[in-house]
């Protein structure tokens, strides 16, 4: 039996969640006040998120919480206290990058669905099979994968597969970029990316400018747009 795909949208705030659901999204992923990959976004506070979970369920929708950064060892106990209220409220799934977080969530909340973030760089069949073995219910494929690579993973493993179909692209492999850390001391894997790849740069060769800075967005890829291959996806 052919399944209908879930339309999932990012929600940078609770207000954005309302708009996404009104526009037809089946689910949203949203960051809270801690441990998300968008530390400088208008993230929801805990009370607002608890209300958002209720709102989603009241309207037959789902809400997934992002914990898609690398955590320090001393933050693990704080993570438990952070997640517990959302779990008790009926959170549908948590999206994780860190394998340590993955293990702890599995131990603390055995029945909570875990989605393996694109930041985990799950790029092949063996990775998918291992994540299933560990207890993942869904894998989010890296934006770098081709349609054939996604198809191959789907054929080899019966995990749910989530793929981005529109939006910005990083110039580096998902979860592997250190540019922001090196250039500005802000780690993308801690949710603090300064996005230096979006800045303009000049290109010089032998002391001569061959591409002026005002035309030099050389590290900023064009946005992902898969509308022409949505039927195949």
Please describe what each predicted stretch is.
Residues 144:
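Active-site loop and adjoining helix of the penicillin-binding protein/serine DD-peptidase-beta-lactamase fold
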Residues 113, 135-140:
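Acidic, glycine-enriched active-site microenvironments
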Residues 124-126:
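Conserved nucleotide-cofactor-binding alpha/beta core module
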């Amino acid at each position: 039996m052919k399944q209908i795909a879930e339309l999932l949208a990012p929600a940078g705030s609770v207000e954005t969640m309302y708009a996404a659901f009104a526009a037809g999204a089946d689910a949203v992923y949203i960051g809270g006040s801690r441990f998300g990959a968008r530390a400088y976004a208008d993230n929801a506070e805990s009370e607002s998120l608890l209300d958002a979970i209720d709102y989603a369920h009241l309207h037959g929708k789902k809400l997934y919480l992002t914990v898609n950064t690398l955590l320090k060892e001393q933050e693990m106990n704080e993570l438990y206290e952070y997640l517990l209220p959302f779990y008790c409220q009926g959170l549908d799934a948590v999206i994780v990058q860190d394998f340590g977080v993955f293990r702890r969530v599995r131990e603390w909340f055995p029945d909570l669905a875990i989605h393996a973030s694109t930041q985990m760089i799950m790029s092949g069949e063996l990775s998918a099979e291992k994540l299933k073995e560990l207890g993942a219910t869904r894998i989010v494929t890296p934006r770098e994968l081709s349609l054939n690579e996604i198809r191959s993973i789907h054929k080899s493993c019966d995990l749910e597969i989530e793929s981005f179909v529109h939006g910005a692209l990083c110039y580096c492999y998902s979860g592997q970029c250190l540019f922001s850390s090196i250039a500005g001391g802000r780690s993308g894997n801690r949710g603090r990316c300064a996005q230096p790849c979006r800045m303009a740069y000049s290109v010089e060769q032998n002391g001569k400018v061959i591409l002026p800075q005002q035309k030099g967005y050389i590290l900023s890829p064009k946005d992902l747009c898969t509308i022409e291959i949505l039927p195949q996806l």
